[in-house]
Amino acid sequence: MTDEFGMVEPQEGEAFGDEWEEIDVSDDEADRIARRKDRDFDEFRMRLKDADQFKVEQSVFDDATFAAIYKLVQDGHIDAFGGPISTGKEANVFEALGGDDADVAVKIYRINASDFRHMRDYLEGDPRFENIGHDKGQVVRAWVRKEFANLERAQRAGVRVPKPIAVQRNVLVMELVGVVDDRARRLSEVRVENPQTAYEVVREYMRRLHRAGLVHGDLSEYNLIIHDGELVVIDLGQAVTVHHPNAEEFLRRDCRNVANFFRRQGADADGDSLYEFVTGDEGEDGDGDE
């Protein structure tokens, strides 16, 4: 396998079985800070609300969201905010300066704007959320913590994803791949050079993710980015375990989407063969396209 697209390797000493620790979705420190509303937090909240990049978000950021950011600043994960990177239906992503002077991405899910039913479709059936309730705030918190846990698991399995750094309530801090002035590009935005090689890297990442017990669930050229010749898988919030009742359906859809894109780019790719490659025995190394 070529390293032309910067394939990473699995972390040593990691083995994956069927063990899944339940993810706690109860109130965290950010909720307690928001309830206390001490003077330091109030002053921080007002400064943040007055910042230009947050003025348009005052109607959707509740006190607990500001408290989550406050706690992440206290813990040294965020030193200063930059501008917005992207604005989506459910979350906004901001550039920020991390505690080690590295650029980080801060993904803030908006409780009131998130698609509650869409999230529940991916959470129900996940063994990590067997006792998830119906409160909208709790569902969004579960979604964010699931994204953080999925990123950690994918990284250990040798899948190139943004490195997860910290999570508080509905706020996720992770590695920023590229910077605003030199941002990473979605594959949908570029003409892929050497599409066969790129396809082989992506399908290997899909197989590693599956062996780690996860299915991305929404993989396509819109959730694959490239920066400095490196392919990165993003948006793992909806990724489900292989035990999810819809895992096979999601995986087959991922395989079709990925294969169709790379075939249009000129690669020898087929959805059914990709599915066989991803789900094949660990000892197999077939090319999946014959």
UniProtKB/Swiss-Prot annotation:
Keywords attached to this entry: ATP-binding, Hydrolase, Kinase, Magnesium, Manganese, Metal-binding, Nucleotide-binding, Phosphoprotein, Serine/threonine-protein kinase, Transferase
* Superkingdom of the organism of origin: Archaea
Q: Where does ATP bind?
A: 85-93, 107, 175, 177
Ranges annotated as biased composition (Acidic residues)? 11-22
EC?
2.7.11.1, 3.6.1.-
Q: Which PROSITE patterns match?
A: PROTEIN_KINASE_DOM (PS50011), RIO1 (PS01245)
GO MF, any single term? ATP binding
In this chain, the stretch annotated as Disordered covers 1-22
Free-text description of this protein's post-translational modifications in UniProt = Autophosphorylated.
Catalyses which reaction(s) = L-seryl-[protein] + ATP = O-phospho-L-seryl-[protein] + ADP + H(+); L-threonyl-[protein] + ATP = O-phospho-L-threonyl-[protein] + ADP + H(+); ATP + H2O = ADP + phosphate + H(+)
Q: SMART domains under this entry?
A: RIO (SM00090)
* Sequence ranges assigned to domain Protein kinase in this UniProt record: 79-290
Answer yes or no on keyword Membrane. no
Q: Where is the active site?
A: 218, 235
Q: Which cofactor is essential here? A: Mg(2+); Mn(2+)
Q: Give the residues the record marks as binding Mg(2+).
A: 223, 235
Q: Which NCBIfam families does the record associate with it?
A: Prot_Kin_Rio1_Halo
According to its UniProt entry, what is the function of this protein? Serine/threonine-protein kinase that is able to autophosphorylate as well as to phosphorylate proteasome subunit alpha 1 (PsmA1) in vitro. Despite the protein kinase domain is proposed to act predominantly as an ATPase.
Q: Which family does it belong to?
A: Belongs to the protein kinase superfamily. RIO-type Ser/Thr kinase family.
Annotated protein name in UniProt: RIO-type serine/threonine-protein kinase Rio1
The record lists the organism as Haloferax volcanii (strain ATCC 29605 / DSM 3757 / JCM 8879 / NBRC 14742 / NCIMB 2012 / VKM B-1768 / DS2)
The gene from which this protein is expressed is: rio1
